[in-house]
Design a protein with these regions (language model features):
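Iron-sulfur (Fe-S) cluster-binding modules
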Residues: 1-67, 75, 79-91, 105-118, ...
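Short, well-ordered alpha-helical microsegments
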Residues: 99-102
């Protein structure tokens, strides 16, 4: 899932300081799952903004908080917010960067304030209470060849043909030796499966054209039936 983190309150307050009417919109997708941007977090941010204005002796803030199914879906965002957004000059979004941009596109006359920093595509380790980056969305997945361990993401240098000379005792030289060397993990995984032929396979340099930005994916739009 997309992993995100709420911005510092000071930064959110600064972006919102010139608005007397604000709509806070959470997202029930990724940011809600990781408890950063759902309905509960929207209500908490609403209370904090109201408190901040009162403590500074400013005029009363008119603010509403809600959450929608997915902010990254044009139709859902437009349909869910069309009636409520018209009363507010600015919207605080608790979605990832995609959600923020979707709202900005659908409501071009509104100021969309991002309250969340999008970090990476990752895995949640509930027991450790941590999120780990696992995928770069590179557009050319080779996980079958690497035992389900991504060298593009988990190797600090994104090497494709084995470890560099900087690994020591299975640890990467980048990050003060805290991270496992991805290619040592790959070697051990493939060895367990008797698939070391995949480890020794030579891989050509990546074709970065498949990950050029901005990207799009999808077929041709549906043809509308002509009216008789």
């Amino acid at each position: 899932m997309i992993i995100a983190q709420q911005k510092p309150l000071k930064e959110i307050f600064e972006m919102a300081k010139n608005f007397k009417r604000l709509l806070i919109v959470g997202c029930d997708g990724c940011t809600s799952i990781i408890q950063v941007g759902g309905e509960k977090q929207a209500q908490v941010l609403k209370s904090l903004l109201e408190m901040e204005r009162r403590l500074k002796g400013k005029k009363k803030l008119t603010i509403e908080a809600s959450s929608i199914l997915r902010q990254c879906d044009r139709d859902i965002a437009s349909t869910s917010l069309r009636s409520s957004v018209k009363d507010y000059p600015a919207v605080i979004s608790l979605a990832c960067g995609v959600g923020v941009q979707t709202l900005a596109e659908q409501f071009p006359d509104k100021i969309i304030i991002p309250a969340v920093d999008t970090k990476f595509i990752g895995m949640h380790d509930t027991e450790a209470g941590k999120f780990y980056e696992m995928c770069r969305a590179c557009g050319d997945c080779i996980l079958f060849e690497t035992g389900g361990i991504c060298p593009i993401t988990r190797c600090a240098k994104s090497l494709l043909n084995g470890p560099c000379g900087g690994q020591a005792k299975g640890k990467c030289e980048v990050g003060e030796g805290k991270n496992d060397c991805a290619w040592i993990l790959i070697y051990n995984r493939l060895k367990e499966r008797n698939k070391l032929d995949l480890f020794t396979k030579f891989r050509l340099p990546r074709d970065y054209r498949v990950s050029e930005h901005p990207r799009e994916l999808g077929g041709e739009p549906e043809e509308k039936e002509e009216k008789a």
